């Protein structure tokens, strides 16, 4: 059934933060199979409204929750997709093409099939199975999983263990389980000089040489050596702007944006202090003014592998005959919110085609993921 579920889910044009009926489809399906469901819509305005779902079968512990998102990123040029449509499924050579196939409608389809089959085959299991789904993970993530977790806990629900269905595997299904994530902090630096004629530089103060020196130092600084589970923290310049299209004018100001992905040796605040010390030093030397802004959407985190995390890894190894590596690579995810409530793993399909034109998953990979999810429910419940 996971193939049918995936085909149906791909058909919903659920570009962030819209559900476009995807969450309603899952809600109806789970309700038909005895789940207690609730859809909540959060958001400050109509354009920001986010659709969320919590569905649970059973009332006993442990409550094993699948956490995921139905929203997808923009599909780009539709003409470049199979069937010229990212939201119309194309099945070729054992693969299913469509936006969201791996990120992450494929994982949702597999856990739907696994949980419904498990409930059908095990009428007296000891715990509960639940879903927490949102239509805003790829965007601001303000009114999605974070807000929904707080809501369900206020209602008296408790999650004992979560599986976040992000596409975590690198080369084959089962080679990686994420137990943490790097943090992310964005910076915007504005440097104010004094404009003037290029022939009279002594009557002006060009902010660009100062910016170049600063960015050169920042991009070459070694923030750390990494840790057992984390790679080195990394800074990337993402944008440089100079509002000057005239070749004989020294610009008055310039602006640069950069991002740091960081491990658990840092926080956004400590990095901001380190960055500002470098900026302050050079701006003083060049006698220019600066303004530095920063914002962090996620701090880094790492979990010590709990018994349930180890049990999940054993199920992966037993099912797929591959020993998974505990990993923290990749971008941010909603796991950063879930970890405040319960132990978790992130485990899903291959990440190779996520967000790309002609995103696809192999049907054989869907079967492997279904098997892992089903076997874990058998083992833990």
From Swiss-Prot:
> Which Pfam families does the entry mention?
M20_dimer, Peptidase_M20
Cofactors per UniProt? Zn(2+); Co(2+)
- SUPFAM superfamilies tied to this protein: Bacterial exopeptidase dimerisation domain (SSF55031), Zn-dependent exopeptidases (SSF53187)
Q: Which residues form the active site?
A: 71, 137
Q: Which UniProt keywords apply?
A: Amino-acid biosynthesis, Cobalt, Diaminopimelate biosynthesis, Hydrolase, Lysine biosynthesis, Metal-binding, Zinc
Instruction: Give the reactions, separated by semicolons, that this protein catalyses.
Output: N-succinyl-(2S,6S)-2,6-diaminopimelate + H2O = (2S,6S)-2,6-diaminopimelate + succinate
Q: Which pathway is this protein engaged in?
A: Amino-acid biosynthesis; L-lysine biosynthesis via DAP pathway; LL-2,6-diaminopimelate from (S)-tetrahydrodipicolinate (succinylase route): step 3/3
Q: Which Gene3D superfamilies match?
A: 3.30.70.360, Zn peptidases
Q: CDD domains per the record?
A: M20_DapE_proteobac (cd03891)
Q: Is Amino-acid biosynthesis a UniProt keyword of this protein?
A: yes
Co-factor note (free text): Binds 2 Zn(2+) or Co(2+) ions per subunit.
Q: What is its EC number?
A: 3.5.1.18
Which terms in the Gene Ontology molecular function aspect does this entry carry?
A: acetylornithine deacetylase activity; cobalt ion binding; succinyl-diaminopimelate desuccinylase activity; zinc ion binding
One GO biological process this protein is involved in is:
lysine biosynthetic process via diaminopimelate
InterPro entries associated with the record = ArgE/DapE_CS, Bact_exopeptidase_dim_dom, DapE_proteobac, Peptidase_M20, Peptidase_M20_dimer, Peptidase_M20A
Q: Where does Zn(2+) 2 bind?
A: 103, 138, 355
Positions annotated to bind Zn(2+) 1: 69, 103, 166
Q: How does it assemble?
A: Homodimer.
Q: Which family does it belong to?
A: Belongs to the peptidase M20A family. DapE subfamily.
Q: What does this protein do?
A: Catalyzes the hydrolysis of N-succinyl-L,L-diaminopimelic acid (SDAP), forming succinate and LL-2,6-diaminopimelate (DAP), an intermediate involved in the bacterial biosynthesis of lysine and meso-diaminopimelic acid, an essential component of bacterial cell walls.
Q: What is this protein called?
A: Succinyl-diaminopimelate desuccinylase
**Source organism per UniProt:** Rickettsia africae (strain ESF-5)
